[in-house]
């Protein structure tokens, strides 16, 4: 028996060993093979440690599942079908497992231990020993494998879904970025279009402003009409007869008719034609002087009075009463406002005129002052350009009202005027209206009236003038970007070692003149009046005086301590006589300049004053 047992094993290796291997394979698939012969099983059990058998088992374990089918066909026919079906299903599961394993190996390696591969592929001895275990252990292992397969498949599905979600999110983010970039580009295009439209609109506005300025550039001078409200005839040559529309302040009715009339010269001049107002260039408004439009000689008695104002005449005459009648006191004052301050200022001005004329009438030695109120102030430039026929006519033109100074219109070309403020814009037209109604009203009275009216106006009424002020300021800044306001210094003069201002100097001279008048012994004659007016009141354009008139004046009667103001223009034109030269040489010469006042009127650059002690 002992000799036959190994022989039987060696002789029938194909039958017994294959059946054992089939049994092992069936145990792995939860279907153990019980049809093995009884003689083969003890043979395997009696020699468990045989190396030949172990190697054979190892080779049979790696054999394909079709090897089990051939020995099973020779065995009993009962388990043939279940074994074949289980082998086919096992091979299919292994193929699926290998395919899934290749896909999810990187994720599995992180979850399992390092020796899982050897255990799973059966390369370790422990796996070989486990394979030979019981049916319960094999079933448990297979159950664990199935659970792991399901977990791996679920993990694979999760990874796939996460990957697809990431792709979708990336696509959505890219689309959002594209949309944002498109919106930003559209916004930039819209902003560029709007900026271009704004630039075009600004250009159009500038063009319109230039056109408006060109239309409103020439100032139309309104003539001062006589007190008789008769409309003057209009010639067909005057194509500019348009109603002047001032800036609206208060809706009032104006009784005067704003019509243009051809002017007539006041005095006949040789070789000089009468200037038509349509041919004159537009000139800035002189706020202190009266309008330069000449009056018709047949409409008022003031020209005839002006002819006799500075000439030789008897002492007793009725000129002041006629001059006062020339100013229209009966005009309605509706356009001047309804306030008490306005009417009070006008009444004060009239009382001042009456008192001044009465004082001049009572003083016998100053007949030349009686008609100074009714004289118009004409520019010195026109007087110098025009040739005079008679010295008395030129003297009439050169007399100024109440000693007021005349300034030449030809200022320095580099002088830049300041832009007008809101009050000046409003007062420009209002001053014209007041001068039309009251040609003889003094500038100070007009300023009081305008100031009281401006204070009584509301902010809503002042708003358009403030807007005009802003427009003029912008225009001035564009025209003169480097302009800087430099006020002129105050006028001062040194008298007897003291530096006095102009007001103090005038007050001092006034008191000294009043004291000097009392010491005069010369009878009041026209010649003396002419000389004294020329000496005491300097004029912008002096006239050569006749020698008998100069000799008629006695300088010995003056106070020796009183400085006398001598007109230097008349000194130059008289040929510089000996007495005058000595007075200029012995005297002190001072130059003082006029500071700009608030009304923006024209002033002379410098005035030469010669003081002799």
From Swiss-Prot:
Disruption phenotype: Mice show severe growth abnormalities. Severe reduction in the number of Rorc and Vgamma2-positive mature thymocytes in fetal and adult mice caused by the loss of Blk expression in Vgamma2-positive immature thymocytes. This results in a severe reduction of Il17a-producing Vgamma2-positive gamma-delta T-cells in the spleen, lymph nodes and dermis. In addition, the number of Vgamma4-positive thymocytes in the fetal thymus is transiently reduced, with levels returning to normal in neonatal and adult mice. Residues 77-336 are annotated as: Required for homodimerization. Disulfide bonds: none annotated. GO terms for cellular component: cytoplasm; nucleoplasm; nucleus. Residues 25-34, 572-593 have a biased composition (Basic and acidic residues). Its main location: nucleus. It comes from the Eukaryota. It is found in: Nucleus; Cytoplasm. Residues 594-613 have a biased composition (Acidic residues). Residues 15-24, 297-307 have a biased composition (Polar residues). Residues 416-484 bind DNA. GO terms for biological process: gamma-delta T cell differentiation; negative regulation of canonical Wnt signaling pathway; positive regulation of brown fat cell differentiation; positive regulation of gamma-delta T cell differentiation; regulation of DNA-templated transcription; regulation of gamma-delta T cell differentiation; spinal cord oligodendrocyte cell differentiation. One of its GO terms (molecular function) is DNA-binding transcription repressor activity. Homodimer; homodimerization reduces DNA binding efficiency. Interacts with isoform 2 of TCF7/TCF1 (via N-terminus); inhibits WNT-mediated transcriptional activity. Interacts with HHEX (via N-terminus); abolishes the SOX13-mediated inhibition of WNT-mediated transcriptional activity via competitive inhibition of the SOX13-TCF7 complex. Transcription factor that binds to DNA at the consensus sequence 5'-AACAAT-3'. Binds to the proximal promoter region of the myelin protein MPZ gene, and may thereby be involved in the differentiation of oligodendroglia in the developing spinal tube. Binds to the gene promoter of MBP and acts as a transcriptional repressor. Binds to and modifies the activity of TCF7/TCF1, thereby inhibiting transcription and modulates normal gamma-delta T-cell development and differentiation of IL17A expressing gamma-delta T-cells. This is Transcription factor SOX-13. The lineage of its organism: Eukaryota, Metazoa, Chordata, Craniata, Vertebrata. The gene is Sox13.
């Amino acid at each position: 028996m002992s000799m036959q047992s190994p022989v039987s094993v060696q002789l029938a290796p194909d039958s017994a060993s294959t059946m054992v291997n089939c049994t092992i394979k069936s145990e792995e698939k939860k279907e153990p093979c019980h049809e093995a012969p009884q003689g083969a099983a003890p043979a395997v059990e009696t020699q468990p440690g045989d190396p030949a058998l172990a190697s054979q088992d190892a080779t049979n374990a790696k054999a394909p599942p079709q090897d089990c089918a051939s020995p099973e066909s020779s065995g009993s026919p009962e388990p043939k079908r279940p074994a074949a079906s289980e082998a086919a299903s096992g091979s299919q599961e292994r193929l699926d497992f290998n395919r899934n394993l290749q896909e999810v190996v990187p994720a599995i390696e992180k979850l399992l231990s390092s020796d899982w591969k050897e255990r799973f592929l059966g390369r370790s001895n422990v796996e070989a020993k486990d394979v030979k275990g019981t049916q319960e252990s094999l079933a448990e292992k297979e159950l664990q494998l199935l659970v792991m397969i399901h977990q791996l498949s679920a993990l694979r599905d999760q990874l796939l879904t996460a990957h697809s979600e990431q792709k979708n999110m990336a696509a959505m983010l890219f689309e959002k970025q594209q949309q944002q970039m498109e919106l930003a580009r559209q916004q930039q295009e819209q902003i560029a279009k709007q900026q271009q439209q704004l630039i075009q609109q600004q250009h159009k506005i500038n063009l319109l402003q230039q056109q408006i300025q060109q239309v409103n550039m020439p100032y139309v001078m309104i003539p001062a009409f006589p007190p008789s409200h008769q409309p003057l005839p209009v010639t067909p040559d005057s194509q500019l007869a348009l109603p002047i529309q001032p800036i609206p302040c208060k809706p009032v009715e104006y009784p005067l008719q704003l019509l243009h009339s051809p002017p007539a010269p006041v005095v006949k001049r040789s070789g000089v034609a009468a200037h038509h107002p349509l041919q004159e260039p537009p000139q800035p408004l002189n706020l202190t002087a009266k309008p330069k439009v000449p009056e018709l000689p047949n409409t008022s008695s003031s020209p005839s009075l002006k002819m006799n104002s500075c000439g030789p005449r008897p002492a007793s005459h009725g000129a002041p009463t006629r001059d006062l009648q020339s100013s229209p006191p009966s005009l309605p004052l509706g356009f001047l406002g309804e306030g008490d301050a306005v009417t009070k200022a006008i009444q004060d001005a009239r009382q001042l005129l009456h008192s001044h004329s009465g004082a001049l009438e009572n003083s016998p030695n100053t007949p030349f002052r009686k008609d100074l109120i009714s004289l118009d102030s004409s520019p010195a430039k026109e007087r110098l350009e025009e040739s005079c026929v008679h010295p008395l006519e030129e003297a009439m033109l050169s007399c100024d009202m109440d000693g007021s100074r005349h300034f030449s219109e030809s200022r320095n070309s580099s002088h830049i005027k300041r832009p007008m403020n809101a009050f000046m814009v409003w007062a420009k037209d209002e001053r014209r209206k007041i001068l039309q109604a009251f040609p003889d009203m003094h500038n100070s009275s007009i300023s009081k009236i305008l100031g009281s009216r401006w204070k009584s106006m509301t902010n809503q009424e002042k708003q358009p003038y403030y807007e005009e002020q802003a427009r003029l300021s912008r225009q001035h800044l564009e025209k003169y970007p480097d302009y800087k306001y430099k006020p002129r210094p105050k006028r001062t003069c040194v008298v007897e070692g003291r530096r006095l201002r102009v007001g103090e100097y005038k007050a001092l001279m006034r008191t000294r003149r009043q004291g000097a008048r009392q010491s005069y012994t010369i009878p009041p004659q026209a010649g003396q009046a002419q000389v004294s007016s020329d000496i005491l009141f300097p004029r912008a354009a002096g006239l050569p005086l006749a020698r008998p008139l100069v000799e008629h004046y006695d300088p010995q009667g003056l106070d020796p301590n009183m400085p006398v103001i001598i007109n230097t223009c008349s000194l130059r034109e008289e040929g510089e006589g000996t007495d005058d030269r000595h007075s200029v040489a012995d005297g002190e010469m001072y130059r003082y300049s006029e500071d700009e006042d608030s009304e923006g009127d024209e002033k002379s650059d410098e005035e030469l004053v010669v003081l002799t002690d």
